Amino acid sequence: MSLLTEVETPIRNEWGCRCNDSSDPLVAAASIIGILHLILWILDRLFFKCIYRRFKYGLKRGPSTEGVPESMREEYRQKQQSAVDVDDGHFVNIVLE
């Protein structure tokens, strides 16, 4: 019987599986992989904003600031932070002149 068509049905007042090959190592491995996939999917949906922002902005190295005055460094940091803050919302209003 296929994994897709197995249904748990009441058998003698107990819940059980009608298939006889449930102790098959392949079925056990598929179950473990399915559970891990579900856990990873849930974590991805819970933390997607943190995860993808980290990949988008955190892994990029900015330009070298060697020889740049501190005031210009601070201005650059503020621009980078404002770019990250814009990404917080789902919609961004763009005004064309």
From Swiss-Prot:
Protein name as catalogued: Matrix protein 2
Xref: InterPro entries: Flu_M2
Similarity section: Belongs to the influenza viruses matrix protein M2 family.
Chain positions of site Seems to be involved in pH gating: W41
Lipid positions (S-palmitoyl cysteine): C50
Other information: When the channel is activated, one or more imidazole moieties of His-37 probably become bi-protonated.
Modified-residue entries (Phosphoserine), positions: S64, S82
Main location: virion
Residue stretches spanning the membrane: 23-43
Role, per record: Forms a proton-selective ion channel that is necessary for the efficient release of the viral genome during virus entry. After attaching to the cell surface, the virion enters the cell by endocytosis. Acidification of the endosome triggers M2 ion channel activity.
Gene: M
Bilayer topology: Single-pass type III membrane protein
